[in-house]
């Protein structure tokens, strides 16, 4: 028998007494990634929500937080950060496909909500820092760690002006 997910919450008392309740769940969710970054394996995802009764449904309002890592899009060094995404979703029985989440047998499962929020918030092109200089496109040196002697490529559209400058220098 599979172990019970910590993201499964019994909401019978919330529905019966119509009293809101705060839930904080910290657990691992495997395979959270997009093309540019991921939640490191073994890392905890924090789901902090207020569960509010709405008749026979439950509204979850709060945040989802998780660490992330991925290669910097400019220098390829590993970049790290923490994402935080807002959530405001409804759980009901029967659920409306794509609109609400299922509430079944007086239980809700926060994992699909957390998974969707994290995947939407993960950076697709991470930066190690805002002012990252990146790699030199000619020699490949990391310009955050040193400089190179490569000259920037000349724009061919300005070549006529370069010729004028050369002509002026020769005449003097």
Predicted features and spans:
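Structured interface patches
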Residues: 1-172
């Amino acid at each position: 028998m599979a172990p019970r997910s910590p993201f499964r919450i019994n909401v019978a008392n919330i529905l019966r007494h119509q009293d809101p309740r705060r839930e904080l769940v910290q657990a691992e969710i495997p395979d959270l990634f997009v093309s540019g970054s991921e939640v490191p394996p073994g890392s905890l995802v924090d789901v902090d929500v207020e569960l509010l009764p709405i008749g026979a449904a439950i509204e979850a309002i709060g945040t989802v937080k998780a660490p992330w890592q991925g290669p910097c899009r400019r220098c390829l060094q590993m970049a790290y950060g923490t994402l935080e995404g807002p959530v405001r979703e409804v759980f009901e029985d029967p659920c409306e496909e794509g609109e609400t989440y299922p509430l079944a047998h007086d239980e809700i499962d926060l994992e699909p909500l957390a998974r969707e929020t994290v995947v939407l918030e993960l950076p697709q092109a991470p930066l190690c820092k805002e002012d990252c200089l990146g790699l030199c496109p000619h020699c490949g040196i990391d310009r955050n760690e040193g400089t190179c002697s490569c000259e920037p490529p000349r724009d061919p559209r300005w070549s006529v002006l370069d010729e004028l400058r050369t002509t002026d220098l020769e005449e003097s």
